C-alpha cells in the first residue's frame, strides 16, 4: 500500500476523532508526498495527547480526550435507551408510525426535543426496531385505551367538582385568616396605644409624687389599672388569632390532602393502566409537541444528574414571619410583665412604643398573613393540576367543542 492510500485513510480517521474532542488539527510536513513510498515507519505526526503512526496504520488516543470521548458515547447510549423506553411505555404505535414515516412530524419532534443531529439519528434507528414490537401489541393497547377513556369520562367530572369546592374553601379560609389577622392587628395597635398611655400616666405619677405630697400616686394607680387592661386585651387578641389560624390551617391541610389523593388516582391510572394516552388525542401536531417536550425533559434530567447541586430553600415570607414572631414575643413580655410590677414603667413605655410603631407599619402595609399566603399558594397549585386533567378530559370527550 502506497503512502497516499495509507495516509489518506489514517488522516481521515484522525480528523474525525480530533473533532469529537473539540479540537481541529492541521499537520504540516517539511516534505512532499511524491518521493516517499517505501519507508513509512518514521513518518509520524504529534499533537497534544493524540498520536498518529502511519507505519503501523494504528490510530491511538490517550489522556482526557479518550476518556471524554468514551463518556460522551456512553451518555448518548443511555439517553437513547431511556428515550426508547419512554416511547415503548407512553407513545401509541399510531404516533410512532407517524413520526417514523412523516418527515415534517419528525422535524417538529426533533425541534421540540432540542436533539442534536447525532442523538436524533441514533434515536430514529432505535425507534425503527421498536416499531415492529409496537405493532404486535397495538390491538391490545387500543382496548386498554378505550377502557381508560370510558373510566376517565365517567369519573373525572365528579372529582373535578369536589376539587373545585376544596379550592374555593381554601381561598375562603385564607381570606378568613387574613381578616382575623387584620382585626387583631388593629386591636394590637389600640392595645399598644393604651399601654403607652398607661405608662405615661404611671411614670408621671411617680415623678410628681414628691411635689404633690403623694396625691399623684392616684395617677400612677390609674395607669397601672389601664396597663393591666391593655395587657389582658393584647393577650386575649393573641389567643384568638392563634386559635383561629390553627383551626383554619388544620382544615386546609385536610382539604389539600384529600384533593391531592384524588388527583393522584388519575395520574397513577394514566401511567399504569393505559400508558398510551397520547393515542387518544385528536390533535397530532400537539401530541408531537408533547412527546418532544417529554424527551427534552428526559435529556435535561440526565444532564442535571451529572452535576452535584445543593439547593437551599428558604420559604417566601419567612423573614417577615420571623420578624413578627420576635415582635409578638416582645409584646407578650411587655404586657405580661406589666401586670406584675409598675416600678419599671419607663421600660414598658419604651416597649409599648416599639410595639405601636411596628403594628402601625404592619397595618399600613396591608396586614398580610403568612398563613393566608400559604393557603392561597396551595389552592393555586391544585388549580393548575386540575387544569391539566381538564384539558385531557376535553380531548378525550368526542362531544366537547372547543
From Swiss-Prot:
Q: Subcellular localization, per the record? A: Cytoplasm
List the InterPro entries hit by this protein, alphabetically. Answer: ApoL
Q: Name one GO molecular function term.
A: lipid transporter activity
Gene Ontology CC terms, in alphabetical order: cytoplasm; extracellular region; membrane
Q: What upregulates or represses it?
A: In vitro, is responsive to TNF.
Keyword entries, A-Z: Cytoplasm, Lipid transport, Transport
Q: Name one GO biological process term.
A: inflammatory response
According to UniProt, the tissues expressing it are described as: Widely expressed; the highest levels are in prostate, lung and placenta; also detected in kidney, bone marrow, spleen, thymus, spinal cord, adrenal gland, salivary gland, trachea and mammary gland; levels are low in brain, heart, fetal liver, pancreas and testis.
Pfam families linked to this entry = ApoL
Describe the function of this protein: May affect the movement of lipids in the cytoplasm or allow the binding of lipids to organelles.
Similarity remark: Belongs to the apolipoprotein L family.
Q: What is this protein called?
A: Apolipoprotein L3
Q: What is the lineage of its organism?
A: Eukaryota, Metazoa, Chordata, Craniata, Vertebrata
Amino acid at each position: 500500500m502506497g503512502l497516499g492510500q495509507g495516509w489518506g485513510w489514517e488522516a481521515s480517521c484522525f480528523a474525525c476523532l480530533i473533532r469529537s474532542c473539540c479540537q481541529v488539527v492541521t499537520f504540516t510536513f517539511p516534505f512532499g508526498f511524491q518521493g516517499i513510498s517505501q519507508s513509512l515507519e518514521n513518518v509520524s505526526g504529534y499533537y497534544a495527547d493524540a498520536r498518529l503512526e502511519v507505519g503501523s496504520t494504528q490510530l491511538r488516543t490517550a489522556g482526557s480526550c479518550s476518556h471524554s470521548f468514551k463518556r460522551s458515547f456512553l451518555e448518548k447510549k443511555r439517553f437513547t435507551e431511556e428515550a426508547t423506553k419512554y416511547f415503548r411505555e407512553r407513545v401509541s404505535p399510531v404516533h410512532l408510525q407517524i413520526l417514523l414515516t412523516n418527515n415534517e412530524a419528525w422535524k417538529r419532534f426533533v425541534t421540540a426535543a432540542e436533539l442534536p443531529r447525532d442523538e436524533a439519528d441514533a434515536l430514529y434507528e432505535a425507534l425503527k426496531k421498536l416499531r415492529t414490537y409496537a405493532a404486535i401489541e397495538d390491538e391490545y393497547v387500543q382496548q386498554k385505551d378505550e377502557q381508560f377513556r370510558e373510566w376517565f369520562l365517567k369519573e373525572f367530572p365528579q372529582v373535578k367538582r369536589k376539587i373545585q369546592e376544596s379550592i374555593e374553601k381554601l381561598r375562603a379560609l385564607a381570606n378568613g385568616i387574613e381578616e382575623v389577622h387584620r382585626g387583631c392587628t388593629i386591636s394590637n395597635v389600640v392595645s399598644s396605644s393604651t399601654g403607652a398611655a398607661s405608662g405615661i400616666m404611671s411614670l408621671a405619677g411617680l415623678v410628681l409624687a414628691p411635689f404633690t405630697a403623694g396625691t399623684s400616686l392616684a395617677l400612677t394607680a390609674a395607669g397601672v389599672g389601664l396597663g393591666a387592661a391593655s395587657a389582658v386585651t393584647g393577650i386575649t387578641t393573641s389567643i384568638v388569632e392563634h386559635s383561629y389560624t390553627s383551626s383554619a390551617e388544620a382544615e386546609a391541610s385536610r382539604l389539600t390532602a384529600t384533593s391531592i389523593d384524588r388527583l393522584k388516582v388519575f395520574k397513577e391510572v394514566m401511567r399504569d393502566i393505559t400508558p398510551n394516552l397520547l393515542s387518544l388525542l385528536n390533535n397530532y401536531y400537539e401530541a408531537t409537541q408533547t412527546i418532544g417536550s417529554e424527551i427534552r425533559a428526559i435529556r435535561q434530567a440526565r444532564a442535571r444528574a451529572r452535576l452535584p447541586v445543593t439547593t437551599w430553600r428558604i420559604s417566601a415570607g419567612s423573614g417577615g414571619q420571623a420578624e413578627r414572631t420576635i415582635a409578638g414575643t416582645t409584646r407578650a413580655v411587655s404586657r405580661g410583665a406589666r401586670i406584675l410590677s409598675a416600678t419599671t414603667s419607663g421600660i414598658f413605655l419604651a416597649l409599648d412604643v416599639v410595639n405601636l410603631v411596628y403594628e402601625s407599619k404592619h397595618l399600613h402595609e396591608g396586614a398580610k398573613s403568612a398563613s393566608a399566603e400559604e393557603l392561597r399558594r396551595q389552592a393555586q397549585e391544585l388549580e393548575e393540576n386540575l387544569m391539566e386533567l381538564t384539558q385531557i378530559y376535553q380531548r378525550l370527550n368526542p362531544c366537547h367543542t372547543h
